């Protein structure tokens, strides 16, 4: 570059900055940005469809908004006033409805709270450039908000101007809309970047609300979880993934998500189940956590039959992938042919177990993995429904566009489950298309194959292999998302002996306190071991039994703390979140969240406690990944200035 061997590139840059003055101004702007405080990052994991606590934690920035209100109004507002202001920022529309019913002098209330919101907004926007704040402003009020943010209300020369704006907003009956706009702007400015470290989907009631919220969020990235990849595979047309998704939904009485939210017709499955399992009580398939106020006995009976029907279909479909892909090394998971159908037993590892359920009306004992003609028709109908669900396709496309298997960002390595290892602490390898992959290369290969599975032409070999890989990522021993040797689905349904249910974790989990392992992973992913951290979820932290989410002297942080209600008996909490601001890292542990309605009607907040993971000298933008990009831009602009001044490129005035 110094020898101007890349004049072509500089000529292109000159179109954007056609004069010395323009290039100089941009250099000054970029240098100034480098000295601003680093924006706040917010980390969440393992949401499992639990939309209410997710929405609340997103709105409160894991306590960041409450802290900002305390900083601004510590000595000027009473605790009850701070609490009321906090609720207004979180839930402006709902809070306004209550205020309008109860407040006698609404114009006075408007005036007081508009001043408070402007002061708070001024505080949270102070770490950003005017340009960045301007881009975040709601279009309807952008000019007015910008004026108010940059005018001090105690400036005597402008006091009348400032007050005039507020009074006019109230007078023309735009105060409600303005309060909503300011509140949402504050929420947006408090968090600069959101990281979702997997498992948006699972057994929770409304993963769709979570995804719709994320689609509209200003800055987000996603690291796929094992449940996410399962739904992604289903949306891509993998019938085994479809069967798994339906089985889990039936198991947890969550078929409403499939039928009502994603518009997938389950009547063919219900009809099939009633026909073929009519005289089967399906006792081992009664759904868990059924709310008797929502489901009658006949509905539970139907779901149980659907549950069993799709489970048997799943086992048959898995055979097709396992035989098609010998490199998956999963023949040992084919169990339907190991059953002794005459006495209802199965022999595993030389031990014979009696089956809990001995009724198999759709299995041909001479060819147990063969789909019946009715099963084939059903699977085809379900596949068409999943592929043609517009809402599901929109959500899965978003997961591909904003997601990946892992992310390196500001010296943090983010992934959902694990980096597959061997017992000797070396990277576990897998052969794909005759080539061996391990470590970062394995995850990169998985990522690209999953994308081929979704985006390739239907019927192509690339499409088929890609969707098979998505199923493997759900259940395979080398999957960074699954993180175990085997998924014992059959054993959990059909064998009472719980020793057969155990799923052996990848050795990665035994080494999470090993600095040697963490450093090896950092080097593999091109990160500096002295400055980097691993942040992941997937395995609930058993806080109530004394497990610490901060491992390996702070080099590894696990933030699966129990957003999913099913895991709270293990964790003793209702979730961990993490924030990383200019002062360092804070781990926040959350108690169970009652409801959004309770939050705005009673001004309750989720009870949380904060633990400082790492305190830093104040980090600036220049210390971040964005800072590195800006420094490269500055370097190029300085070269452009040289080219202008040496006459190698002409200014265009």
UniProtKB/Swiss-Prot annotation:
Pathway: Carbohydrate biosynthesis; gluconeogenesis. Keywords: Carbohydrate metabolism, Hydrolase, Manganese. Its EC number is 3.1.3.11. GO terms for biological process: gluconeogenesis. GO terms for molecular function: fructose 1,6-bisphosphate 1-phosphatase activity. It holds the Pfam family FBPase_2. It catalyses: beta-D-fructose 1,6-bisphosphate + H2O = beta-D-fructose 6-phosphate + phosphate. HAMAP family: FBPase_class3. Belongs to the FBPase class 3 family. This is Fructose-1,6-bisphosphatase class 3 2. It comes from Clostridium beijerinckii (strain ATCC 51743 / NCIMB 8052) (Clostridium acetobutylicum).
């Amino acid at each position: 570059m110094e020898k101007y061997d890349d004049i072509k590139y500089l000529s292109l840059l000159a179109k954007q900055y056609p004069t010395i003055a323009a290039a100089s101004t941009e250099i000054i702007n970029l240098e100034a940005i480098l000295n601003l405080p680093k924006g706040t990052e917010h980390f969440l994991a393992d949401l499992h469809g639990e939309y209410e606590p997710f929405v609340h934690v997103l709105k409160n920035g894991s306590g960041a908004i409450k802290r900002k209100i305390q900083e601004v109004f510590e000595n000027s507002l009473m605790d009850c006033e701070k609490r009321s202001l906090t609720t207004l920022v979180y839930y402006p529309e709902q809070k306004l409805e209550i205020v309008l019913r109860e407040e006698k002098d609404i114009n006075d209330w408007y005036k007081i709270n508009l001043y408070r919101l402007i002061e708070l907004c001024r505080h949270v926007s102070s770490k950003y450039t005017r340009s960045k704040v301007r881009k975040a402003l709601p279009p309807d009020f952008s000019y007015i908000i910008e004026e108010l943010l940059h005018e001090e209300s105690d400036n005597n020369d402008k006091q009348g101007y400032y007050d005039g704006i507020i009074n006019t907003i109230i007078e023309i009956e735009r105060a409600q809309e303005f309060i909503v706009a300011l509140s949402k702007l504050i929420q947006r400015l408090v968090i600069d970047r959101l990281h979702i470290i997997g498992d948006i989907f699972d057994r929770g009631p409304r993963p769709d609300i979570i995804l719709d919220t994320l689609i509209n969020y200003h800055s987000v990235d996603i690291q796929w979880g094992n449940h996410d990849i399962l739904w992604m595979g289903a949306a891509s047309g993998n019938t085994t993934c479809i069967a798994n998704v339906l089985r889990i939904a039936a198991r947890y009485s969550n078929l409403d998500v499939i039928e009502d939210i994603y518009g997938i017709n389950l009547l063919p499955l219900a009809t099939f189940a009633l026909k073929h399992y009519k005289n089967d009580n399906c006792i081992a398939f009664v759904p868990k956590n059924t709310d008797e106020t929502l489901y009658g006995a006949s509905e539970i009976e139907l779901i149980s039959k659907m549950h069993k029907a799709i489970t048997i279909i799943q086992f048959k479909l898995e055979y097709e992938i396992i035989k098609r892909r010998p490199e998956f090394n999963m023949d040992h998971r084919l169990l339907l042919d190991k059953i002794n159908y005459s006495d209802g037993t199965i022999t595993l590892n030389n031990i014979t177990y009696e089956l809990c359920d001995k009724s198999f009306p759709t299995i041909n004992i001479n060819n147990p993995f063969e789909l019946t003609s009715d099963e084939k028709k059903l699977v085809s109908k379900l596949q068409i429904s999943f592929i043609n669900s517009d809402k599901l396709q929109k959500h899965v496309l978003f997961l591909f566009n904003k997601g990946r298997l892992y992310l390196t960002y500001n010296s943090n390595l983010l992934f959902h489950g694990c980096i597959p290892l061997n017992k000797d602490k070396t990277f576990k390898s897998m052969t794909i298309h005759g080539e061996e992959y391990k470590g970062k290369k394995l995850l990169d290969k998985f990522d690209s194959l999953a994308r081929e599975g979704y985006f390739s032409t239907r019927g192509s070999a690339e499409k088929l292999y890609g969707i098979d890989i998505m199923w493997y990522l759900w259940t395979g021993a080398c999957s960074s998302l699954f993180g175990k040797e085997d998924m014992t689905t059959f054993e959990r349904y059909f064998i009472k002996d719980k020793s057969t249910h155990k799923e052996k974790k990848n050795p990665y989990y035994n080494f999470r306190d090993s600095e040697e392992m963490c450093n090896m992973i950092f080097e593999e992913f091109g990160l500096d071991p002295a400055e980097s951290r691993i942040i992941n979820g997937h395995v609930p932290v058993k806080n109530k039994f004394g497990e610490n989410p901060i491992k390996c002297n702070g080099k590894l942080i696990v933030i699966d703390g129990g957003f999913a209600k099913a895991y709270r008996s293990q964790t003793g909490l209702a979730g961990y979140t993490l924030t990383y601001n200019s002062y360092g890292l804070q781990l926040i542990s959350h108690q169970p969240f009652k409801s959004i309605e309770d939050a705005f009607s009673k001004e309750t907040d989720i009870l949380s406690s904060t633990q400082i993971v790492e305190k830093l000298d104040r980090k600036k933008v220049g210390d971040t990944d964005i800072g590195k990009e800006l420094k490269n831009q500055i370097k190029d602009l300085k070269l452009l200035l040289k080219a202008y001044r040496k006459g190698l490129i002409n200014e265009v005035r």
